[in-house]
Amino acid sequence: MPIAIHQVLATLGYGDAIGHEALGIQRVLRTAGYDSEIFVETADPRLEKCTLDYRELPSASSRDSILIHHFSIGSHASRIAYALPDRMVLVYHNITPPEYFVDVHPLLVQLCYLGRRELGLYRERCDLALGDSEFNRQELEHLGFPETGVLPVVPDFSHLSGPPNYMHAGNFDDDAVNLLFVGRTIPNKRLEDVIRWFYAYKRWFNPRSRLLFVGAQSGFERYMALLNQLVSEIGATDVHFLGHVTNEELVAYYEIADVFLCASEHEGFCVPIVEAFHMGVPVIAFAATAVPATMNGGGVLITEKDPVHVAALIDQIVTDTSLRDRIACSQDSALERLAANDFGATLLGFVERVQRTPRRPHPPVAFDFWDQVKLADQLEEIRMYRPAAYQALPKDCAEGDELTEDAEGAHRR
């Protein structure tokens, strides 16, 4: 009889890369005959039916089981997973270096720093550590994890297969050139560089153009203020911050886009790049961290961020049909190479590898561990149902939960 292979993660989000991967892993495991549930702290209401509460995980735990742990910064679920007897496969989706948040989110600086330290504690706990890109695997190896591998991201584009919703995107569906960025509004994405590229393009090449930013903005209001200040200072017009959108709206924005721009300096994978490939939008991206591997020969990689140079490149792509066709072919080929990765066979191969490997000694857990878990649960209940009492608690009691909430989206998309 197959063993149980469950997953645990802090949040199952709708439409984000980690959520897609967790659901894909579950489909593969269940098809292979394994009992497989997803345990979470929180889930998007549309996905709650796919999950169980993380506090039920201990009752499903067994020495014979395997637990796939999607590492998250400072989550209650992570700490419970650490203490359970199951064999563990850790999946690392990357933690953004804290220096990116120094000027805009001091608390997140602390949390990302602590998160990288916490990750190191799992060296002795997990039987296998997987990155969802070679860049992430190399980080794990650098941290001293003895057994590592790559579980490649094979994006599920089903969320882009529905009919487009042009209710808002229709306002931009005209003869102007639309430059698009999709992703969270967060400093490592370097949206200020994208704004400078657009400003140079609009000023020197095409005044009939606009820049569209699509992606969640919550938690980084200070960074948003800096971006708006930059737009005002340089006199840029037609810059639109559109926030989080539905899948149907996202399809519409991809359909009206002429060029996709990515200036990010730190990515563990960057799913929007391959979404743009899939939607036939030419991509210009800065060659940093995992981005070159994600592009995999598709699109246009740049190694310098000079605005005039990038603006001239945008103009070439927009005006030269032959060049645009060659870029489209390169992106289609990159997608074919990505799709050739057999995600299911790779995952099941890692499961067999863990089963064949002698069990590692379980690291010691503090004698009061479960008392601390119970206390954390009580604090969470107070926060949810008696917020005034929660606010009256000493700062060091309540601060950890606030930090975790702000950080959960910091490395998505």
Tell where the protein language model's regions lie, with residue ranges.
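Short alpha-helical donor nucleotide-sugar binding micro-motif in glycosyltransferases
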Residues: 252-257
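Aromatic "clamp/platform" in nucleotide-sugar-dependent glycosyltransferases that forms part
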Residues: 265
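Donor nucleotide-sugar binding/catalytic pocket of nucleotide-sugar-dependent glycosyltransferases
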Residues: 123-166
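Conserved donor-binding/catalytic core segment of Leloir-type glycosyltransferases
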Residues: 130, 170-189, 195-198, 212
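Short hydrophobic beta-strand element within catalytic cores of glycosyltransferases
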Residues: 273, 282-285
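Conserved acidic donor-binding segment of nucleotide-sugar-dependent glycosyltransferases
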Residues: 300-307, 316-321
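Nucleotide-activated donor-binding/catalytic signature segment of Leloir-type glycosyltransferases, i.e.
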Residues: 224-248
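Glycosyltransferase donor-sugar binding loop
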Residues: 41-44, 208-225
